[in-house]
């Protein structure tokens, strides 16, 4: 694939993922091979709602999409509708009601706790921004998504970073041990590869290069998303550093 198209895949696919923590870019080996057949005018992506359960589960709402080049470096990003996890992420901005929401979520999880193999997409907001090391002390469960900013203006979701399934799916060596075990380090690596020529493409995904660089420099987590058994809600809610917790979606899974 031409180097220019590689660059666009690096910027576009990650920008879509970073701007929409309610969805997951499906990083699969066959998709990487498919990318090599693309022209520099568009990049194919497979996107699915951030559904709870194992990676082998068939997810309702999975879509084959493409990101197209426009003039002046802008791109046409795919439309992704809001759904329950989107609403949970938006609720992070409702700080006056955090305690009430947390209590309601804890009560709901207690009722659902008796259902065997019930998994949930759990959205957490922290009372104050935390380092990744502090987040790891809250639970032994590793978060699936780091929320590296608060919810942004104009209903934009938090800046985020998640794990990819394959080493080169993001356009750089995501299996490098220096970054593989740290979502913060992975995000910082991506931001370090961006330059001013990417500004218009990033704007197409409601992202700002200065904003991304600031988040990378600070390296602080404002929240996290977990794909876990419903019982994790009680553990997370018990920590005073967690100001709000929501269950975005539940499903039976492994």
What role is predicted for each listed range?
Residues 1-225, 229, 234, 243-254:
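Loop-rich non-cytosolic ectodomains and luminal regions
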């Amino acid at each position: 694939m031409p180097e220019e198209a590689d660059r666009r895949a690096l910027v576009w696919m990650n920008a879509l993922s970073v701007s929409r923590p309610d969805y997951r870019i499906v990083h699969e080996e066959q998709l990487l091979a498919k990318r090599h057949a693309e022209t520099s005018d568009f990049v194919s992506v497979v996107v699915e709602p951030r559904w709870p359960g194992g990676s082998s589960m068939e997810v309702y709402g999975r879509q084959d999409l493409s990101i197209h080049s426009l003039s002046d470096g802008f791109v046409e990003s795919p439309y992704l509708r809001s759904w329950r996890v989107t609403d949970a992420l938006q609720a992070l901005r409702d700080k006056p009601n955090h305690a009430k929401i947390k209590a309601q979520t804890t009560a709901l999880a207690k009722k659902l706790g008796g259902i065997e193999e019930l998994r949930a997409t759990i959205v957490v907001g922290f009372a104050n921004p935390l380092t990744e090391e502090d987040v790891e002390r809250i639970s032994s469960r590793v978060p699936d998504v780091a929320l590296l900013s608060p919810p942004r203006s104009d209903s934009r979701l938090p800046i985020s970073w998640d794990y990819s399934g394959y080493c080169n799916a993001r356009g750089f060596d995501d299996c490098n041990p220096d970054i593989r075990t740290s979502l913060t380090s992975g995000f910082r690596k991506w931001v370090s590869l961006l330059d001013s020529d990417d500004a218009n493409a990033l704007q197409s995904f409601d992202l700002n290069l200065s904003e991304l660089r600031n988040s990378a420099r600070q390296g602080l987590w404002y929240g996290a998303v977990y794909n876990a058994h419903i019982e994790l809600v009680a553990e997370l809610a018990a920590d005073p550093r967690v100001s709000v917790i929501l269950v975005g979606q539940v499903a039976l899974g492994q």
